[in-house]
Regions:
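Solvent-exposed beta-strand motifs enriched in subsets of small alpha/beta binding domains
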Residues: 184-228
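Extracellular repeat turn/loop positions enriched in glycine and acidic/polar residues, especially those
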Residues: 8
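Active-site-proximal helix/loop segments of hydrolytic enzymes
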Residues: 2, 11-13, 19-190
Length: 228
C-alpha cells in the first residue's frame, strides 16, 4: 500500500502562521515525519512526502506527484486559523471533497474520532470542501486540521512535541483501522532497521552536509548529520 503525506504549505507561505509568528508548516512537517516512522512499521506500506523543506511545492505539483505514483491514500496535515488575530475558535475537523466520496468519508470519520479521543479537543466533525488537494487527487484523500493557531491555548499545544506525536499517532491509528494494516513482525522490523541505514560523506564543511540532509528530508528520507 502506498500512502502520501502532505505537510500543508511551506516555511515561506504568506499568512500561514500564528499571530505571534509560528509558521504552520513547522507543525505540519513534524507530524508528517512522526507519521512516516509509524506507518513504516506496517506490512507492505510505502510512504511518500508531497512537500519539501527546501522549497514551496505548489498544490498542483503535490497532486500530480500523488497521481503519478498512484498512491492509495493521500493525507494532508494542517493547523487551522480563523482570521489573523487571537480569538476563541477551537477544535479539530477533517475534510473530504465536496461530493463526499464514501471511502474518504469513512477514513475521515475514523481519523477524526481518534484525534478527538487522543487530544480531548472540541469535535468540529467531518466536513466537505473544494480544496485542491481533495479535488485533484485520484485516490482516497482527506485533509486534517489539528487545532487553531489563532487560539492561544491551542497554539501552545501545536508548539508541543508531545501534542505533535499525539496527533501523528491518532491519524495513523485511523488509517490503520480503515485499511486494516498489520504490524510487521519483530524479525521484519529488525531486518528493516539493519538494511536501510546509509552513511553519506564525509564532508569537510558542516554546511555542505546540512544542505544534503535538507534535500534528503525533502524527498522523504530520515536524514541527520553526525560530527566526528
Amino acid at each position: 500500500m502506498k500512502i502520501m503525506l502532505d505537510a500543508g504549505h511551506s516555511y515561506n507561505t504568506v499568512g500561514k502562521r500564528s499571530p505571534d509568528g509560528m509558521r504552520e508548516y513547522e507543525f505540519n512537517r513534524v507530524v508528517a515525519n512522526y507519521m512516516k516512522a509509524l506507518l513504516e512499521e506496517y506490512e507492505g506500506v510505502t510512504v511518500y512526502f508531497s512537500h519539501s523543506d527546501k522549497k514551496d511545492v505548489s498544490l498542483q505539483e503535490r497532486t500530480d506527484k500523488a497521481n503519478q505514483l498512484a498512491v492509495d491514500c493521500f493525507v494532508s496535515i494542517h493547523a487551522n486559523a480563523y482570521g489573523s488575530g487571537w480569538n476563541e475558535a477551537q477544535g479539530i475537523e477533517t475534510y473530504v471533497y465536496k461530493t463526499k466520496p464514501p471511502e474518504a468519508t469513512k477514513l475521515a470519520e475514523r481519523v477524526q474520532k481518534n484525534l478527538i479521543v487522543a487530544t480531548g479537543l472540541r469535535d468540529r466533525g467531518v466536513k466537505s470542501a473544494n480544496f485542491h488537494v481533495l479535488r485533484a487527487t485520484k485516490m482516497t484523500a482527506i485533509l486534517v486540521e489539528c487545532g487553531f493557531m489563532t487560539n492561544q491555548s491551542e497554539l501552545q499545544l501545536l508548539r508541543s512535541d508531545l501534542y505533535r506525536k499525539t496527533c501523528a499517532e491518532a491519524i495513523v491509528k485511523g488509517i490503520r483501522e480503515h485499511f486494516q494494516l498489520k504490524l510487521k513482525s519483530p524479525d521484519q522490523l529488525q531486518k528493516q532497521e539493519s538494511l536501510f541505514h546509509v552513511r553519506i560523506g564525509p564532508f569537510f564543511e558542516k554546511k555542505q552536509a546540512e544542505e544534503l540532509m535538507t534535500r534528503l528530508r525533502g524527498i522523504g528520507y530520515e536524514a541527520s548529520v553526525q560530527e566526528g
